[in-house]
């Protein structure tokens, strides 16, 4: 599982955070001792607090953010040192799954599929809006009742292109959930991301040992900053997709969170905090529990606070958040991201 900061939150009052719900979901089909969490050093205590079932060796701590390709590559080398023929599920920790039995069935079928081939598998979801925060999958031939060959894989397109994809009816969202054999993904990395593969393969003798953390702390920051989608999935010729309806939503996007949340009579969503809204509609407000939001005259806005950052922007301009993050990193460093 890939853990991010906001996954500590219980958005829907279930008593379990998004991270804990993801763990609960996967432990139904994967032994607890085989579950790993990859996260930043900053969140080590948080993960240990939320998932006491895991021991420290099951929590891989990145010394710095380097995007998903280095994260997944490191986990693959680590896993191969423990099990040279492991089959792997890579899952973000901010997903909501409403149809868990169908989802877990797809996971089990997917693991069986990648166990007998060198294919890289992703889950595809039929889109209901042009969303720039997801990758888009165009399918080619249907190889059996569950799997399709991927024709094109486009990582997080601009809004106009996303609109074209959705209107065509030929594209599916990439759910950001992948399955593969450990040797298949390492081979793909060696072919398509040789710089990254060379850097991490240099630690082959220390993975799974007490020296692993020192090696990662020294070498991980120099890994190329590239996503698994752009670095491998867009370029590989052995990518397949399993299509399904799992009641899936990526709560890493505010649009998804708004769609799934209970609304007041003016279509406003308030989560965690309390609010007084006047002459306002179609907004989503996410503030800490001890905060009161008093809002007058806003329509279609996102107002969200996390630690030391307050974000206020048009809800339909969510695709600009990537720009805000990049600008903040360039101008202010990572203290506010």
Please tell me what each predicted stretch does:
Residues 182-337:
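Left-handed beta-helix
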Residues 36, 88, 170, 177-178, ...:
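A residue-level structural signature of the nucleotidyltransferase/glycosyltransferase Rossmann-like core
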Residues 11-92, 98-104, 108, 316:
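Conserved N-terminal catalytic core of the sugar/cofactor nucleotidyltransferase
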Residues 37, 60-61, 90, 121-125, ...:
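General beta-strand structural signal in soluble alpha/beta enzymes
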């Amino acid at each position: 599982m890939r853990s991010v900061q906001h996954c500590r939150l219980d958005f829907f009052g279930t008593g379990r955070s998004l991270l804990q719900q993801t763990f609960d979901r996967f432990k139904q089909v994967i032994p607890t001792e085989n579950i790993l969490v990859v996260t930043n050093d900053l969140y080590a205590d948080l993960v240990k607090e939320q998932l006491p079932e895991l021991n420290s060796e099951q929590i891989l701590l990145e010394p710095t953010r380097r995007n998903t390709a280095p994260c997944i590559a490191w986990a693959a080398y680590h896993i191969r040192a423990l099990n040279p023929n492991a089959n792997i599920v890579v899952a973000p920790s901010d997903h909501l799954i409403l149809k868990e039995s169908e989802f877990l069935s797809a996971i089990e079928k997917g693991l069986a599929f990648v166990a007998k081939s060198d294919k890289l598998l992703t889950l595809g979801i039929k889109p209901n809006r042009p969303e720039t925060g997801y990758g888009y999958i165009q399918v080619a031939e249907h190889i059996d009742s569950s799997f399709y060959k991927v024709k094109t894989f486009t990582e997080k397109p601009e809004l106009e292109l996303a609109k074209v994809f959705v209107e065509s009816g030929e594209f599916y969202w990439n759910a950001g959930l992948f399955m593969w054999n450990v040797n298949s993904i390492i081979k793909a990395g060696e072919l398509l991301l040789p710089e990254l593969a060379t850097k991490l393969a240099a630690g082959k003798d220390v993975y799974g040992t007490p020296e692993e953390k020192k090696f990662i702390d020294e070498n991980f920051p120099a890994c190329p900053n590239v996503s698994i989608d752009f670095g491998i999935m867009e370029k590989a010729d052995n990518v397949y997709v399993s299509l399904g309806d799992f009641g899936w939503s990526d709560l890493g996007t505010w649009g998804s969170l708004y769609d799934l949340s209970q609304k007041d009579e003016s279509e406003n969503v308030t989560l965690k905090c309390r609010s007084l809204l006047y002459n306002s509609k179609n907004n989503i407000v996410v503030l800490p529990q001890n905060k009161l939001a008093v809002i007058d005259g806003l329509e279609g806005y996102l107002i969200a606070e996390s630690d030391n950052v307050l974000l206020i922007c048009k809800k339909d301009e969510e695709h600009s958040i990537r720009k805000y993050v990049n600008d903040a990193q360039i101008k202010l460093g990572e203290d506010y991201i």
